[in-house]
Structures are given as structure tokens and as C-alpha cells.
Design a protein with these regions (language model features):
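Secreted, luminal/periplasmic, and some membrane-associated catalytic domains
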Residues: 37-39, 46, 60-61, 71-72, ...
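Generic recognition of well-ordered alpha-helical segments
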Residues: 65, 92, 546-553, 612, ...
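Glycine- and acidic
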Residues: 358-365, 417-428, 532, 633-638
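C-terminal motif of bacterial Sec signal peptides marking the signal peptidase cleavage site
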Residues: 24-27
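Bacterial N-terminal signal peptides that target proteins for export
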Residues: 2-16
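Second-shell loop/turn segments in exported
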Residues: 52-56, 79, 138-140, 637-639
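Low-complexity, glycine/alanine/valine/leucine- and proline-rich hydrophobic stretches
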Residues: 593-640
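A long, amphipathic alpha-helix that forms part
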Residues: 34-36, 52, 365-391, 407-454, ...
């Protein structure tokens, strides 16, 4: 009987392997390009590049390639979306639609049935298993961005297209005859935006657990010169209750105390202090027939007297990703064959580990610039060795470096440090200088007569203080608590990605409005929210106007200066088929202020204004678009004086002579005719 069962399991395993292989083969098919490459357009995105910083450093001669483009071609501040958040703006960049058309209004959205936040970029359907063993329904991930990306329209028209690290392309859009590698939005294997691990012997039992934003702190207890622990990976899809699948990890300190040996996933590597490991491949077994793989690497922060190690997030293995991250499916495997193993996580630079002060500024910059250079090499290789008619490549380093180093440009920031500023005050400039070199290299690699367009999705501001919007709503009578005076516990991203509860102290029967995300307020509408109290129509309209007036009049009690620049009603700034999902109110703050982290996650701390004591010190997410513009440069002069990020899609389509894929909100920018490619 046992033998028969074993034989049956082996046959089932072989059948599943054949099915997986068949799915892989189907995903790897690539239709041939139709048109020869006679016209070339290259679009480079540099997330968060600010027009004021660009202009300042270009005038100082520090950005020679970009300055030359501005003089011989064109430079304009680029209008952005409201709110000027990366996913919102890149969705409009790709489709030429405003957020009411794309359906992307923030990183987060709320479920009106539960009031719980969830990621706005994708929706997920869980896998189903028979007896917890046999997958009878695969997991499904749905890209929530509506609209047809311009690179999809171009590829459909027969133009060879290559897209590298494009935000909001998870899962990726099929690009007939072309290639696409998804960027911002791709999760780690844990299903988060990048959970780093920190292993340390100095941690107390009270230190361990989840950090506010994206970290796992693990205490090591030495047994002689050895320590054992686990790496927690993905949620077990076969379990009835919430639990994560783990794999063991071992550390062994050398007798001399100058190195540590790491054993993980069947691989062993010995590292001295202040050194990076190579990539580790880690397999998490779901059941006897199914496992998923990730890659990660370590940095040894200290060996003695305390053992302290940083471990990168669990990136989906680019050679066998459990979820689609590229089109065709084997594109990232081809890149690995050419360029070696690389990160696949959408949030490419580990801002969270620096923000939680588990790595330092130097280590963050080393890793970020190495990652930026890897993307530059891939971009140049595609241009030189497999040139397409359209290439799009979006870099994130300019944004991520700005987020965590803006404090060193702002002596008034609570985390300004003169000593650190002397050492790392040029960190943001360094990211711009690398941007400049990439632009020069790309321009030289392009076909003669091609069109080069450089864009950023938004600019930047210092962020000195956070605004607890839900606390303001409580104090102004728009939200009622079950237990007034009882402060919420601090929330973390694990609550969002895990099994946390939100708004546990809110009395929905007496609440009129609630805040979630980075600047959004929702009315507790009857007929829409599960426990709605507010009647749609005049009652709701009156409340929104009242909230607008009070927020715009609110002053910082320390400075007596206005905090909010402008409050918009959703119906004033959004239009399109996804309007039912839009926030009712969008709050845009003045320079120096932003929605607090805890408001973004749905918490209700005690005070309204809180000092920003984090290294994440620059932001844009709930700023006003009028003073948070991005940049637009091109090697061709442009006549249009007020370009918008919505204009890029129709402009590229027009240059290549492609019919627009339906209505677009953006306009075609007026260029001089491109020179013919010889």
C-alpha cells in the first residue's frame, strides 16, 4: 500500500513538473517584431529628480550632459499628478490618463466593506490546494492599473520595444516582439515591498519583531561560537491559519573572532567584517511537490564583540520567479546569464534598513549606486546589442537617495547632523551625477537621429513634521472613538501585509470621515461604506467644504504657520471610469509637512503634529503638484511651455506614427521634426 502511494505521488509529481514546464514554455514565447528599426525613441525615467536641484547643479557645471541637452534641446519643469506620488504619476506617464482613468490614487486603497487598507497596485487571488498538497488553482495577481501603456500600443503596431524596470508592471503587460522587466510594485517573496532582516546578539527580547516600515529584527543567542535561527519567508498558502514558511540559518564565528560563516539553503560562505556575501539561493518548500525560491545576500556589520548581520530582502529568484515579473517570462533569466544575479524587488534600494538605522549611510549608498550601475549596464547593452525602436528604462536611485538624505541639505530638519552633512551632504548630488553620466552614455549608444526624452515623475521637499490626520478628525468631531483618550498602538507594515487589525477603537456608528494613505480622506457614506452614517448629496457636500476650510486654516502650534497648502475634492481633480474608487478629499501639504506614517497605515496617535525624527527626511507624496513638478528634457527643442507627465504617452505614440489606443488625457508635445535615421 505504501509503495503504491509512493508510486502515485511520484507520478503526480512528474505530472505537475510537466504542467509547470508547459506553462513556462508558453510564457517564453515571443512574437517576432514586424518593423525594421528605422526610427528610435529612448525614454529615460529618473524617479524624483527635482527641477530646482537640477537647475542649481546644472548651472554649477556638475551635470554637463544634461546641461547640454537643456541648451541644445529642451528643458521644462514637468507637471505631475495630484497627488505627486510615484505610482500615481508613473501610471499616468504610461497611459496618458489622469488617476480617475488609471485607478491608481495612492500606494494604498481601502476596502469600504472592512475599512482595511490594502495595496492599490495589485489585487490577489489565493491558490487553492486539494488536501493541502495538489494545486488545483494557481495564485493570481491582477495589475490594478487601467489604460493601455504607450509601449504596449507601440509594440502592438509592430515596433520593437524594450522596457526596463517599469513601475506598475506587475504582473507585466505582454509586449509582442519585445521585452519588459517589471519594476516598482514587484514584491519580495514575503509579499511585501522589501522586508530586510537584521540578526544581532545585542538585541534584547523586547527589541525583536517587526519595525514600523519593513524590517525583521532577529535576536541571536550564541552557543559557544555558533548561533542558529530561521528566515521567515512566504505565507503558507495551504494553511488554514496565518503562518509563514521558514528555513533554518546557522552562523559560526571563527576562533580568531574576525570572520563568520553563514550556512543557508545548502550554501556556506565565510565573511570577514564589513564585507558583502555573494547571492544565496533559498528554497521554501510549500509541500512535497511545490517550492518557491528567493535570492538574498548578507553584509557583516560586526563579528565581535557582538555578531551583527544585515540580510537583504528575499528577492524573487530572477531565474525561476514564482510570479511573473517579466515578458517573456525568461527575460530575467536571460539577463542573469549575461549580467549575473540581480535584485528583482520593485523597491530597489533598501531605504527601510537605513531608516530603521540598521545600516549606515555609506553602506546604503554603496548598495544603491551599485544597483543603479547594474541597470545602466543592462540598458546600454540592450541599446548596443539588440537595439529597439522604443526603449524605456526607469531608475529609482534619485528618488530613494533623496528620501533618506534630504535632512543633510536642510539645517532646520530635526535630524540634520553637521558631521554627517560634511561626509554625505553630496549624496543626492552624487545620484544626479550618475544620472548625468547615464544620459551621456545612452545618447552615444542611440541610433543617429533618434529622439531622447528624460523625465521624472515629481520633485522633492524637506519633511520636518508629520500630520496625524485621523487625530485631527477626532479632535474636530468627524471621527468618534469607542474609548476616548486610549491611544492606538503603533502600526507597522506587517499589519498591512500580515494579519493586523485596523481602526479597532473607531466607533463607526458615530464617525463621518476617516483617513488612510498619504493625504486621502474618505467619507463614511451610507450605502458605500459598510457602517456608513453620512447621506450622499448635500450633507456630504457640506461636510467636505467644512473639512476643507478647517484644514486650510489649521496652523502649526509651534510656528503659527499654515500646514496645509490646499485641500481638493476628489471630483475636482479626477475624472474617468475609476472615479468610484477615488478618495473624497485630497490633502496637499506645504513644504516641510507630510501625512504621518501612522496616518498612512490608519492609526490614531495622540497629537496632531509630530516631529519627523526618521532619516526618511525628504518627501513629495502629499505635497501640492504646483510646487512638486518633475523634469522634462529632450535632445529636440520643444515648443510646448507647460508639459505634463500625461503628455509623454501621446507624444511617443505620435513620434512613431502609432494610432492612440483610445482616449488620452495628455496632449502631444510640439517638437521640431526628427532627423531621419541613416
Amino acid at each position: 500500500m505504501v509503495s503504491a502511494q509512493s508510486d502515485g505521488l511520484r507520478k503526480l509529481g512528474r505530472l505537475l513538473a510537466v504542467l509547470v514546464l508547459a506553462l513556462g514554455i508558453c510564457g517564453c514565447r515571443r512574437a517576432p517584431a514586424v518593423r525594421p528599426v528605422t526610427t528610435q525613441v529612448v525614454v529615460l525615467g529618473f524617479d524624483g529628480a527635482d527641477p530646482n536641484l537640477f537647475s542649481k547643479w546644472a548651472k554649477q557645471g556638475k551635470l554637463p550632459n544634461l546641461a547640454r541637452l537643456a541648451q541644445t534641446g529642451s528643458f521644462r519643469p514637468l507637471g505631475t499628478t495630484n497627488p505627486p506620488e510615484s505610482p500615481v504619476a508613473w501610471a499616468s506617464f504610461a497611459t496618458g490618463l489622469n488617476p480617475g482613468g488609471t485607478g491608481i490614487f495612492d500606494f494604498l486603497r481601502r476596502d469600504p466593506e472592512t475599512y482595511l487598507p490594502e495595496l492599490a497596485l495589485v489585487s490577489r487571488e489565493k491558490a487553492k490546494f486539494l488536501f493541502g498538497l495538489i494545486p488545483i488553482k494557481p495564485p493570481r495577481v491582477i495589475n490594478e492599473r487601467s489604460g493601455v501603456p504607450f509601449y504596449k500600443a507601440v509594440a502592438d503596431a509592430g515596433y520593437k520595444t524594450t522596457v526596463i524596470r517599469m513601475p506598475l508592471e506587475f504582473p507585466p503587460t505582454p509586449i509582442p516582439g519585445g521585452k519588459l522587466w517589471a519594476g516598482l510594485g514587484v514584491p519580495d517573496l514575503r509579499g511585501t515591498w522589501g522586508t530586510f532582516f537584521y540578526f544581532g546578539t545585542e538585541l534584547t527580547p523586547w527589541d525583536v519583531g517587526d519595525t514600523e516600515f519593513g524590517g525583521k529584527l532577529v535576536r541571536l543567542e550564541m552557543n559557544g561560537n555558533e548561533a542558529s535561527s530561521v528566515v521567515e519567508g512566504p505565507v503558507d498558502p495551504t494553511a488554514d491559519s496565518y503562518r509563514r514558511i521558514s528555513v533554518p540559518i546557522q552562523f559560526k564565528v571563527a576562533p580568531e573572532g574576525n570572520a563568520v560563516t553563514i550556512q543557508l539553503g545548502g550554501r556556506t560562505e565565510t565573511l570577514a567584517e564589513k564585507n558583502w556575501s555573494d547571492w544565496f539561493r533559498v528554497k521554501f518548500r510549500i509541500n512535497p511537490f511545490l517550492s518557491v525560491r528567493a535570492i538574498c545576500r548578507f553584509y557583516v556589520l560586526e563579528v565581535s564583540p557582538d555578531l551583527r548581520l544585515y540580510m537583504s530582502p528575499l528577492n524573487l529568484d530572477p531565474e525561476s520567479p514564482p510570479l511573473p515579473i517579466a515578458y517573456p517570462a525568461n527575460y530575467t533569466a536571460e539577463l542573469v546569464e549575461k549580467h549575473g544575479l540581480m535584485k528583482t524587488l520593485g523597491w530597489w534600494h533598501d531605504t527601510w534598513a537605513l531608516n530603521e538605522e540598521k545600516i549606515d549611510e555609506g553602506l546604503f549608498l554603496e548598495d544603491s549606486f551599485r544597483t543603479m550601475q547594474a541597470q545602466a549596464e543592462i540598458t546600454l547593452d540592450e541599446l548596443k546589442n539588440d537595439p529597439p525602436s522604443l526603449l524605456v528604462s526607469v531608475f529609482l536611485a534619485t528618488d530613494h537617495v533623496s528620501h533618506v538624505f534630504f535632512r543633510l541639505l536642510d539645517p532646520e530638519h530635526p535630524r540634520y547632523d553637521a558631521e554627517l552633512a560634511a561626509k554625505y551632504g553630496d549624496a543626492i548630488l552624487q545620484s544626479y551625477e550618475r544620472m548625468d553620466r547615464i544620459v551621456g552614455d545612452v545618447e552615444r549608444a542611440m541610433k543617429p537621429g533618434g529622439t531622447l526624452i528624460i523625465v521624472s515623475d515629481h520633485g522633492f521637499h524637506t519633511w520636518r513634521k508629520g500630520f496625524n490626520t485621523n487625530t485631527w478628525l477626532v479632535q474636530n468631531g468627524y471621527m468618534t472613538l469607542k474609548q476616548p483618550g486610549v491611544e492606538d498602538k503603533a502600526y507597522s507594515l506587517e499589519h498591512l501585509f500580515g494579519q493586523g487589525s485596523f481602526f479597532p477603537n473607531v466607533d463607526w456608528s458615530r464617525t463621518k470621515a476617516y483617513a488612510l494613505g498619504l493625504g486621502q480622506i474618505y467619507l463614511n457614506l451610507r450605502g458605500r461604506e459598510k457602517f456608513g452614517t453620512l447621506e450622499p448629496g448635500p450633507e456630504a457636500d457640506q461636510l467636505m467644504e467644512e473639512v476643507r476650510q478647517k484644514l486650510e486654516a489649521f496652523q502649526d502650534p509651534d510656528t503659527h504657520q499654515a500646514v496645509v497648502q490646499k485641500v481638493y475634492l476628489g471630483r475636482e481633480i479626477f475624472h474617468g471610469p475609476r472615479m468610484p474608487e477615488a478618495p473624497d478629499i485630497q490633502v496637499d501639504f506645504r513644504d516641510g509637512y507630510r501625512t504621518s506614517w501612522q496616518t498612512a497605515l490608519g492609526a490614531i496617535p495622540s497629537g496632531i503634529i509630530v516631529a519627523n525624527m526618521k532619516k526618511w527626511s525628504g518627501d513629495h507624496c502629499s505635497s501640492d503638484p504646483s510646487d512638486t513638478q518633475g523634469i522634462f528634457l529632450s535632445n529636440r527643442p520643444v515648443a510646448t511651455q507647460d508639459p505634463s507627465i500625461l503628455d509623454v504617452a501621446p507624444t511617443v505614440i505620435a513620434i512613431l506614427g502609432v494610432h492612440p489606443p483610445g482616449h488620452l488625457d495628455g496632449k502631444v508635445l510640439e517638437f521640431k521634426p526628427p532627423a531621419a535615421i541613416k
